[in-house]
């Protein structure tokens, strides 16, 4: 993934890039006449006050909960692999991963930054109860391991291994947190589209939300 030069308001840059993509698309278009009526159907109260499922998330444990969400959001990608994922009954791919991570944290305690650096593909397969014989799942677990290794090294290099110090450094600013996280390759999701660099920063924005 490529580094993106960021200046000004980061979220304005994201919105502007998305607008540029919408204006350049060839196979889809926005029906502006219906945009207002569609927007009126959106459940804004739910968006403003999101809820977290306690059965799938390790909540109520102070700094352990903080580290849980930092780790979960670090690996909140890979939906293209989810058809191959061994899911828990009635759960989506995301909730399957979240619930297995919750189970691991309850049984073994929180991960340290040093532990994240040492995680292997096999470790991830054990944590998330997946079969590495399946090639797409092996690839996903490799990506999870790389992303978590990056997180561990980042925390050790910048924050003496402290999850809390990472959040403190953001100083209650979602934008600053996103900028900090984009120092890691898996968070720096910027892609070119018809001559425009399009920043998504999906996982970084989700971490700020969580």
Model-derived features: positions:
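HhH-family (HhH-GPD) DNA N-glycosylase catalytic core used in base-excision repair
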Residues: 1-210
């Amino acid at each position: 993934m490529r580094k993106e030069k960021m200046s000004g308001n980061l979220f304005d840059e994201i919105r502007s890039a998305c607008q540029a993509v919408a204006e350049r698309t060839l196979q889809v278009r926005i029906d502006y006449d219906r945009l207002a009526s569609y927007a009126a159907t959106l459940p804004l109260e739910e968006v403003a006050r999101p809820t977290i499922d306690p059965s799938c998330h390790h909540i109520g444990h102070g700094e352990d909960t903080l580290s849980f969400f930092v780790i979960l959001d670090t690996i909140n990608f890979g939906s293209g692999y989810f058809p191959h994922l061994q899911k828990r009954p009635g759960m989506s791919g995301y909730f399957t991963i979240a619930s297995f991570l919750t189970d691991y944290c309850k049984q073994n305690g929180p991960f340290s930054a040093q532990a994240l650096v040492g995680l292997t593909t096999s470790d991830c397969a054990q944590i998330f109860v997946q079969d590495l014989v399946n090639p797409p799942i092996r690839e996903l677990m490799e990506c999870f391991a790389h992303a978590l290794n990056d997180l561990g090294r980042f925390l050790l290099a910048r924050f003496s291994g402290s999850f809390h110090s990472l959040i403190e450094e953001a100083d209650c600013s979602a934008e600053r947190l996103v900028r900090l996280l984009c120092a890691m390759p898996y968070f720096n999701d910027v892609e070119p589209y018809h001559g425009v660099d399009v920043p998504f920063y999906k996982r970084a924005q989700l971490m700020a939300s969580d």
